[in-house]
């Protein structure tokens, strides 16, 4: 059965500001993750039109490898790849994830809508009655939700950070009631992994770690990086994306060359290469 969760993420931004903020955050974090190890390849990034709907289509390949937790690596290939396709027709976006090796046994889809409210709409993405009956709603609070100490940075704490350019920041516990502007990201995430014995564990891991924790950390960063993106228009942002994608491409190929050399050295020495896990800090209890 498909596991459906709806995440609602309020932010002290306008919907128009978030359009730039999100793209800046995705490009910045993608580059950082690629420099850490296996990496992300941007295959396509182009305008699209579907009837009256227009936006940008992107296709990426995530080379996960050692970023998987130990228990998941035990039955996943070391060269695991995930393909992402996204249709961004702001303020609506649809994203899908697939794994060629797993075929139709694995699927993740995310529908997102951005609205100028604090997360009060009950069915923003128009789920049908069957979907609503199994949907779980979770509110993500970038200020008050607990954070893993290993991931905490004072400069990315909305309670401490204050923007020089906007004056926003040092958000209080009741910030959703007292802060203007405010908006909400509504994200309906559907996860399915059909594999006997581990289905529930994998589906819950994806919803909790790969999605929920990523949304929480990423949206704290979106706000606390506001002075880096606030003055950007879409033209300068596209240039930033283009430059970042070129740097990621070069870094990815460098990583491949280094990994190939390390593999040869390890084979000669009869030793096993050491791999770091991207999720290791969050999944120690599941190993």
Swiss-Prot record:
UniProt region (Disordered), positions on chain: 252-287
Lineage: Eukaryota, Amoebozoa, Evosea, Eumycetozoa, Dictyostelia
Protein name: Phosphatidylinositol transfer protein 5
Molecular-function annotations in GO: phosphatidylcholine binding; phosphatidylcholine transporter activity; phosphatidylinositol binding; phosphatidylinositol transfer activity
InterPro entries: PI_transfer, PI_transfer_N, START-like_dom_sf
Low complexity: compositionally biased ranges: 254-270
Compositional bias segments (type: Polar residues): 271-287
Annotated family: Belongs to the PtdIns transfer protein family. PI transfer class IIA subfamily.
Biological role: Phosphatidylinositol transfer proteins mediate the monomeric transport of lipids by shielding a lipid from the aqueous environment and binding the lipid in a hydrophobic cavity.
GO terms under cellular component: cytoplasm
Keywords recorded for this protein, A-Z: Lipid transport, Lipid-binding, Transport
């Amino acid at each position: 059965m498909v596991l459906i969760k709806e995440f609602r993420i309020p932010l002290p931004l306008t919907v128009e500001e978030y359009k730039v903020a999100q793209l800046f955050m995705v490009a910045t974090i993608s580059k950082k993750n690629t420099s850490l190890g296996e990496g992300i390849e941007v295959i396509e990034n182009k305008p699209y039109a579907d009837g009256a709907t227009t936006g940008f289509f992107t296709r990426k390949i995530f080379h996960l490898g050692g970023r998987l937790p130990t228990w998941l690596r035990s039955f996943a290939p070391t060269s695991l790849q995930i393909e992402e396709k996204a249709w961004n027709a702001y303020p609506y976006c649809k994203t899908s994830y697939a794994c060629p090796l797993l075929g139709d046994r694995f699927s993740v889809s995310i529908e997102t809508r951005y609205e100028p409210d604090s997360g009060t709409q009950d069915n923003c993405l128009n789920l049908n009655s069957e979907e609503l009956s199994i949907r779980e709603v979770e509110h993500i609070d970038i200020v008050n939700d607990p954070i893993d100490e290993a991931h905490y940075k004072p400069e990315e704490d909305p309670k401490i950070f204050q923007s020089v350019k906007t004056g926003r920041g040092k958000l209080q516990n009741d910030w959703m009631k007292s802060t203007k502007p405010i908006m909400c990201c509504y994200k309906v995430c559907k996860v399915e992994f059909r594999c006997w014995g581990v289905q529930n564990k994998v589906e819950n891991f994806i919803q909790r770690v790969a999605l929920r924790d990523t949304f929480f950390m990423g949206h704290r960063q979106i706000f606390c990086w506001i002075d880096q993106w606030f003055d950007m228009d879409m033209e300068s942002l596209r240039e930033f994306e283009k430059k970042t994608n070129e740097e990621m491409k070069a870094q990815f190929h460098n990583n491949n060359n280094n990994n190939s050399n390390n593999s040869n050295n390890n084979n000669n020495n009869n030793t096993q290469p050491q791999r770091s896990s991207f999720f290791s800090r969050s999944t120690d209890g599941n190993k």
